[in-house]
Amino acid sequence: MFFQNIMIYLFSLLLIPLIVYFLLIYIRLRYSNNSNNQIKTIGLTTLIINLILSMIIFILFDFSSKQFQLQLEEIYKISYFDLYLGIDGISIYFLLLTTMIMPISLVANWNSIDSKNVLSFVIIILLLETLLLAVFLVLDILLFYIFFESILPPLFLLIGLFGSSDKVRASFYLFLYTLLGSLFMLLSIITMSSIMGATAFDALSKANFSYITQLFLFYGIFISFAVKTPTIFLNTWLLKAHVESPLAGSVILAGIVWKLRWYGIFRLIIPLLPKASMDYTYIVYVIGVITIFYTSFSTLRTIAIKELIAYSSVSHAAVYLLSAFSNTIQGIEGAIALGLAHGFVSSGLFICVGGILYDRSSTRLITYYRGMAQLMPIFCILFLYITLGNCGSPLTLNFIGEFMSLYGIFERISVLGVLASTSIVFSAAYTIFMFNRIAFGGQFSSYFFNYVKDLSKREFILLISLVVPAVFFGIYPAVILDGLHYSVSGLIYN
């Protein structure tokens, strides 16, 4: 009976944080004094419970099937649709990534949130996890859009309340750019619903839209995802959002939120619009290659470390975008592996720069750093592992993801595959430069003093929890690739 009801775990992933929301309000009202540690502990415990639940779901999941599993149907009927939940061999990995990154984001800001705003911060984190998980769990395209856009208000508040000096402008940039871009996707969803009379993924996957209809739907959905990924000419909001965001915001943005757009490609474009996605791949590839070159050159010239990491993330996102449209098993599996690796590595880089180093120096300019290996040797060792992961070095999951992604791109359009492979050279150039300047570069800067401490226990746990999966899955990628094979095959050949 226990195993027959495991689909309840999916609903529990969404319900538990909402229950804790009211519990936290009660604690604040009942224990008004000295309850901040209790609030943070309860929030962290909730996130860890969700992580354990997602691991149980992963263990019980049947990877030999390409169908949605553990489906929980008709939880609640809402006027035009029912709430359907389910997972497949693709969404389960993003589910795990979300439940791993969210507790890390909370612990990353454990000591840096003003005592008056701890309750608001924890509630926003819990609400974000609920909405993020809902995007990966729902089996309805309209619900996908609703939860997809519902993430914007909590992110707006997270940056607007807890960000840096220009936080208000950054939060409005993020909100307005991404919201306006989503209008194109909403129009596409309304069109599909009016044609088919249904919004469930299963029903829409059986649709045979005309070529002209597919073309308009493709451009509508792709423009929305291109704004949110972001790609060239549509990335104005990116630097503001990352630079002004609190550490937790940067970790969530790069580690999870970007994956929603990539995941949407596998749900809305490739299976529902196969002809348009095949015929107009070259447009996506040209945009992706231009994005790689633009962001790589921008990264090479910046002196702000947080901007460097943000541009680096866009460059890797462009490789992911190209491989997602490769229409090959190797390319799509590589894209998903690269997305997971990017979640670990980009989160680690932001914690190293926006958290550990910034807490000790109050600056993010690379010109102030050198010789940190003399002061913080343990930090520099873990920082090195994360840096090598960002370069796509062997024995890291990034290497597996980038190699398979570039192979898929080359199989699809060889010339653009060769151009896309320059991302490896560029990423090595700016990432190794960043590490060399921070860790070595001679005697440590007079900007720092001899009493600068190495990693605390909290910081060490944060970094090691990101380094271990990135290295483990790089050495043994079969855990991911074997599980993806059936679902990716069904995505391409159905």
UniProtKB/Swiss-Prot annotation:
Q: Where are the transmembrane segments?
A: 6-26, 41-61, 87-107, 118-138, 141-161, 172-192, 207-227, 246-266, 280-300, 302-322, 336-356, 375-395, 415-435, 460-480
Q: Which UniProt keywords apply?
A: Electron transport, Membrane, Mitochondrion, NAD, Respiratory chain, Translocase, Transmembrane, Transmembrane helix, Transport, Ubiquinone
Q: Domain of life of the organism in this record? A: Eukaryota
Provide a GO biological process annotation. Answer: electron transport coupled proton transport
Under which EC number(s) is this enzyme classified?
Answer: 7.1.1.2
Query: Where in the cell?
Result: Mitochondrion membrane
Task: Give one Pfam hit by family name.
Answer: Proton_antipo_M
| Reactions this protein catalyses | a ubiquinone + NADH + 5 H(+)(in) = a ubiquinol + NAD(+) + 4 H(+)(out)
Query: What kind of membrane protein is this, topologically?
Result: Multi-pass membrane protein
Enzyme type, top EC level: translocase
Q: Which GO terms describe its cellular component?
A: mitochondrial membrane
Cite a single GO MF annotation: NADH dehydrogenase (ubiquinone) activity
Which NCBIfam families does this one have?
A: NDH_I_M (TIGR01972)
What family classification does the UniProt entry report for this protein?
Belongs to the complex I subunit 4 family.
Query: What function does the entry list?
Result: Core subunit of the mitochondrial membrane respiratory chain NADH dehydrogenase (Complex I) that is believed to belong to the minimal assembly required for catalysis. Complex I functions in the transfer of electrons from NADH to the respiratory chain. The immediate electron acceptor for the enzyme is believed to be ubiquinone.
List the protein's name.
NADH-ubiquinone oxidoreductase chain 4
Please name the source species. Answer: Trichophyton rubrum
